[in-house]
Amino acid sequence: MINTEDTFYGQQGGEKILYVTRPHPIASAVNMVKVYIIALILFIIFYSLTKEFSGMSTGLYLISIVIPLVVIFLGSKMVKNYQEKNISYITDRRIVRFDPTTFFATNIRTLSWDEAVKVKTFSPNMLWKQLKIGTVILHARTTVKTVDEEVRHTLSADDIELNDIYLYRDLGNYIDKILFTYKQMPKEVADIRPFIEKPKGQRY
């Protein structure tokens, strides 16, 4: 089954999707730039070696062309594969993340609202913060020793981490709302409206 905006692998009967999230395209573009930078560095290294070893200049020249092209090809495939398959679903029952690890393997991680206890949001740098792109972490019950103790800075195997999310703070507040409603007024979870990826005040 292919994951779409409306359905996903393992979706339960009657499970309502409230929001579908992927890494922001800017993050994908940054990763592509990194691939090209690595390819350029390799080209410069091998090309400079052709001058040092004149007897092997032809072979080194070919290597200086082929290896960077291979890096660009494989790197582009990896970035595209990650962008396409890295998708998460926030539903009225849980959060489900599909995390691609290789070209052919994707890990599926889920965390029910019953087991989730705390949401943390942050941006990795000032530029990302200005672009409203950041990370949303949903901590599981196993991460927190007691309700009053501070959540550990490290992630546990049960936590869900969403990277490069647009409007990350708003999404964190939205998940907080789901958690509060689920634990205090569970019958009203069905009335929660889907999250709209627009600035606050422009969603409904």
What residue ranges belong to the model's regions?
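Lipid-exposed faces of alpha-helical membrane segments in multi-pass integral membrane proteins
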Residues: 34-42, 63-74
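Conserved beta-hairpin
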Residues: 71-120
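Hydrophobic alpha-helical transmembrane segments
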Residues: 49-68
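A membrane-cytosol interface segment of integral membrane proteins
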Residues: 130-204
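Short secondary-structure boundary/capping segments
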Residues: 8-10, 80, 87, 127-129, ...
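N-terminal membrane-targeting/pre-transmembrane regions
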Residues: 1-53, 186, 190, 197-204
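Short acidic, Gly/Pro-enriched loop/turn segments at secondary-structure junctions
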Residues: 102-107, 122-135
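Soluble periplasmic/extracytoplasmic beta-strand elements of cell-envelope proteins
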Residues: 18-20, 89-91, 96-97, 137-139
